[in-house]
């Protein structure tokens, strides 16, 4: 065999080896079952009072959407609004009042909102009730130390509305006497609930939905008279610029639908349909 023929033969063998190896690699890839399923993360910003209900819905939504991870961040509605204003990546906003949502709407941060639940403000005291607060009116007379959420948190705004109503019932100055007993401001309703459950405060304003299993045995509820109370309304909206707009709208549909409403009702929210 000439030198030229030898080179040609070697080149042919090398080519056959490459084709064979490539073919094996290709077959091996085919046996892998095709491309892997892509995963996605849906970020929901929700008021603290929604923690239990939305955590349950999170599990249900993930089961309905394999490969999806729902990341739910709970906090005061005012803090969540600030996060959205500062450009935090998120897909859904669920607020404990309409004022925060209206601000988000006016600033073009969210799409059209819908009311999905209502809640009832209440007062809670420790189980042993050391200040002897038996009825709502006692808040103005008792030697008590109160905790309350920070000023812009919806529950505090609702509480202030209730106290303003109480002035007309119990006399001017009642509401201010109650506010004068506040010794600490908490980040959100859950923090306030824990302070009372631990016996670190004599009373606080919460929502009915905040008397959850982890505090129920350690607190008592003092109802606010119906003629003085207000109704907390909860709006929800998808966030403008969401990278998961279709999934975000599906989450909103879940919350507004029968399954979501049943879950919310189980956690002491009032359903809207």
Predicted regions and their residues:
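C-terminal motif of bacterial Sec signal peptides marking the signal peptidase cleavage site
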Residues: 21-26
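Exported/periplasmic ABC-transporter solute-binding proteins
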Residues: 27-63, 69, 73, 78, ...
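Central helical "cap/lid" subdomain
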Residues: 108-114
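Core hydrophobic alpha-helical transmembrane segments of single-pass membrane proteins
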Residues: 14-20, 163
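Periplasmic-binding protein-like
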Residues: 91-95
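Bacterial N-terminal signal peptides that target proteins for export
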Residues: 2-13
């Amino acid at each position: 065999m000439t030198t030229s023929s030898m080179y040609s033969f070697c080149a042919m063998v090398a080519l056959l080896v490459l084709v064979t190896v490539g073919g094996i690699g290709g077959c091996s890839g085919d046996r892998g079952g095709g491309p892997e399923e892509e995963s996605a993360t849906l970020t929901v910003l929700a008021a603290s009072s929604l923690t239990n209900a939305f955590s349950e819905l999170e599990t249900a939504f993930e089961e309905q959407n394999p490969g999806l991870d729902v990341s739910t961040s709970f906090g005061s509605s005012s803090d969540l609004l600030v996060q959205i204003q500062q450009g935090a990546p998120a897909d859904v906003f669920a607020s404990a009042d309409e004022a925060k949502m209206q601000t988000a709407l006016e600033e073009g941060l969210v799409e059209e909102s819908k009311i999905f639940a209502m809640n009832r403000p209440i007062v809670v005291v420790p189980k042993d009730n050391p200040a002897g607060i038996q009825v709502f009116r006692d808040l103005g007379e008792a030697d008590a130390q109160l905790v309350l959420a920070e000023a812009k948190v919806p529950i505090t705004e609702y509480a202030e509305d209730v106290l303003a109503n109480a002035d007309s019932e119990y006399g001017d100055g009642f509401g201010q006497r109650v506010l004068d007993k506040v010794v600490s401001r908490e980040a959100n309703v859950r923090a306030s609930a824990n302070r009372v459950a631990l016996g670190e405060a004599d009373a606080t304003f919460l929502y009915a939905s905040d008397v959850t299993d982890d505090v129920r045995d350690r607190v008592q509820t003092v109802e606010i008279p119906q003629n003085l109370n207000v109704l907390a309304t909860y709006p929800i909206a998808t966030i403008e610029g969401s990278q998961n707009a279709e999934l975000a709208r599906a989450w909103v549909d879940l919350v507004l639908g029968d399954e979501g409403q049943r879950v919310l009702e189980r956690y002491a929210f009032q359903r809207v349909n």
